[in-house]
Amino acid sequence: MFIFQFLLLLPPTLRCFSKFPFPQTASSLTRAFSQSTSMSINLHSHAFSGNPLLSKFPLPGNPLSPSAALEALNARISLNNTHSSPSPSFKVLPFRNGRPLASSSAGTGDSPPIWDLGWLGLDDLRGIFENSGAQLSVDLLVYLNSSSEDDAVYWAIDVSDKVPELGSNNAAGLCFVELRTLMVATDWSDLQLMGNLAIAGHAKALLEWHNFSRFCGHCGEKTVPMEAGRRKKCSNDSCKKRIYPRVDPVVIMLVIDRENDRALLAKRPMRIARLYTCLSGFTEPGESLEEAVRRETWEETGIEVGEVVYHSSQPWPVAPNSIPCQLMVGFFAYAKSLEITVDKTELEDAQWFSREDVRKALTFAKYKQAQRTAAEKVEQMCKGLEKNRSLASDLNVESADEQHASIVVPGPFAIAYHLISSWAFSDQNVVNGVECNSKNPSDL
Ligand SMILES: [Zn+2]
């Protein structure tokens, strides 16, 4: 089954972390990143992982815990008390139709613009609701976590059918942007931005899960939030089923022909020409991940797989098919047979590619150019100069050097890139300006 993987991205310079709201967490991420310059896997390296708000949840009794924060939030909203204690501060990230509120600022020198998340204070949000004649209620807010360093609690809210003026007044420099666009616009070496991207991905996944779990699947009654929106339960007293946020595991595998030093890459029926990537598919109930790798590979290409070796995993909250969050679980899969029979209902093409061909695709891809294009698009949107078009139509994904590379492969924000590059360049740490924090398949 197809999982959409886009191309692109990444300049090499690290920017400072002056805007990062969680200095100690940022430091720990920095350490993790610097420690990963060897060929070991850096679990913070994948886009949408390394969320600084997910590293620790406060225990019950802590004033920043979900229950205590919810109580404080309830008091401030229901009492309309604007003069209450400023501690803790509440920061809310609004979403509209799955798009987070964002801003953009100029980069330094020749570097691309830098996007940021559009956090709003509680009083500002309440004012925006009041101006629109909408009611801000506690149940709309979903707890993301807190930060003791800045004494703040972070929330997300879906404002899709409310407060229409939010994001439309470009004087404020704020607009709602597709998460995929932000993903491509993110400088992969900027840990602050990578952390922000992960926060937005987590928030988007939680809000989408809330949207489609409004009714109990057992009795049909309405569900209500629990634990400040981190869980839900059925409102029917005779049912009371608990409902947990949904994660869908997807296997993604680079199938390797050891004998002939080739890798199997497939082209999905999509508009992005020349894009070849790893095979992938959802796991079935009752199936192990390794079994899913073998089954999907056989179904889509007729190749039989023997050994299956885990590589790394990546949260993927930007799938196009209304699934809140897939967990991409990456593997190397070693082929036992080599003859390809393409399932034309799933794939347009599948071929064995030599290591040399794959190296060319990685070497001549213009990831940095694509990142700049997306970052400039976000800047234009926040100025009100461009509408939110689909990503595929914006990006010149054919920008890879066709003279030197016959195919293009997904960019560094996709786990497919890391599977492919760690096989193709198993002897190098940096490829085309992108740091490879990946396991060498020859070491497995
Ligand atoms: Zn129920």
Which residues make up each language-model segment?
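Short cysteine-rich clusters marking metal-coordination/redox-active sites
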Residues: C216-C219, C234-N236
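Acidic pyrophosphate-coordinating catalytic loop
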Residues: Q314-Q326, E339
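N-terminal strand-loop-strand
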Residues: E227-A228, K232-C278, Y310-H311, A333
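Short, catalytically relevant binding-site loops at active-site mouths
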Residues: M270-I272, T283-P285, P315-P317
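Short loop/turn microsegments at loop-to-beta-strand junctions
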Residues: V250-V251, L289, E348
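The catalytic Nudix box helix
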Residues: T277-S312, F331, K336-E339
